[in-house]
């Protein structure tokens, strides 16, 4: 989905509810598999926190969902009611392209994973690793979202700086990007022809 939706011009895919539920099941299996590693077969270092690791990998989706659902409940709405308060909507509101939004969120998530990795490498306990991941998860979703929304309302310098950065995320599809776009579109059209 990522390659076609971000890079393809004619090969966009809509996964819908069934697709997102399927991805949720895949992520659940991933987390369950990681957490149920048979310690008798695989020797893991003492301070390797599997729960902090999986939470770091899924940090933005998990904490953004918690933030959005908490806000909906606080407003007296169903936690499942639709709105445009997810983190990716914030980037789009600032003027980021879809690829810029995607790469920004991936970058934020990678930052959390790297912080977990350094905490693990420095020999910090599993509890401290978990505290670091949870603190960063709250920071990159709850605090970051609230801060940027406030800057948008005030039309502050930070807001205009973020808008200037957003303009640079709209790239022309030439050179390497053109090659990737053609490949994504070609691969999907070959699959359709083979059906």
How would you describe each model-predicted region?
Residues 1-172:
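Alpha-helical transmembrane segments
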Residues 99-100, 173-195:
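Acidic, Ser/Thr-rich low-complexity segments on the non-lumenal side of membrane proteins
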């Amino acid at each position: 989905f990522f390659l076609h939706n971000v890079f393809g011009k004619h090969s966009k895919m809509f996964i819908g509810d069934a697709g997102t539920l399927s991805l949720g099941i895949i992520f659940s299996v991933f987390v369950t598999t990681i957490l149920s590693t048979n310690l008798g077969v695989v020797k893991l270092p003492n301070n390797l926190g599997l729960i902090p690791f999986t939470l770091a990998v899924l940090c933005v989706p998990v904490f953004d969902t918690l933030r959005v659902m908490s806000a909906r409940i606080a407003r007296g709405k169903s936690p499942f009611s639709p709105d445009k308060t997810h983190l990716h909507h914030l980037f789009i509101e600032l003027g980021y392209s879809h690829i810029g939004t995607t790469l920004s969120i991936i970058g934020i998530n990678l930052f959390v994973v790297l912080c977990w990795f350094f905490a693990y490498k420095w020999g910090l306990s599993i509890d401290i690793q978990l505290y670091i991941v949870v603190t960063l998860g709250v920071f990159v979703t709850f605090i970051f979202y609230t801060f940027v929304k406030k800057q948008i309302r005030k039309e502050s310098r930070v807001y205009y700086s973020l808008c200037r950065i957003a303009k640079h995320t709209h790239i022309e599809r030439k050179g390497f990007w053109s090659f990737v776009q053609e490949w994504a579109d070609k691969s999907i059209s070959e699959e359709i022809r083979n059906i």
